[in-house]
Amino acid sequence: IEGGNSIGNRRVIGVYGNIEYIPLPDRPATGYDTYSAYWLPDAQVAVMGRNERAGYQVWSAADGYPGDGVYREFHRKDAKSGMHYWRITSPKTDLGDKMLYDPVLALNKVNENSDHYTTLIYHMLNDYKKATGKEGLVMVSFDTELFGHWWFEGVEFIKQVIKKFNTYLPEVERMTAGEYVHSHPPKEAIQIPESSWGQGGHFY
């Protein structure tokens, strides 16, 4: 939607760096942003761009929340029970040297991360409104297996984020994509480029 190259050079993404992403060539800047929804020009289909900053914060093992050393290590299991008793410790720590998992430390970190995330979203929307005079949209979408599977504490994180928005930042509305389009119908139509998911098709 914005143009350019949102991924950068070839790099590994995903909660545990298990997905290689090969970016497409750079495209000229479009003048559009991901703070709005848009119609496609040839169909009554609305599109929203995932906010890179907000999404990367939750998805990235390298720079986001899931890679924190106190969170439970996914790859090391006890040989007999199959249970996970260890924490990530650090990205470079060998599996055999992982420290034992402490659920209290992990829960404290979830509280810290959810505080940071709700504040981040609030300031992103507030800064956008100050700059443009318009209400903005921050769209985030994730594979559901991220929460509770790859990132064991992810379910609690989502729970706390929703609770904190409801309690402390009720002015930040949470809604589904369909609810947003219904209450804020797009005003512009854009042509989106083909990607590996839409190539040769019509995106709907």
Spans of features found by a protein language model:
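His/Asp/Glu-enriched short active-site or ligand-binding loop at hydrolase and phosphoryl-transfer sites
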Residues: 9-22
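A conserved hydrophobic secondary-structure block that centers on an alpha-helix together
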Residues: 1-6
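Active-site and substrate-binding clefts of carbohydrate-active enzymes
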Residues: 27-204
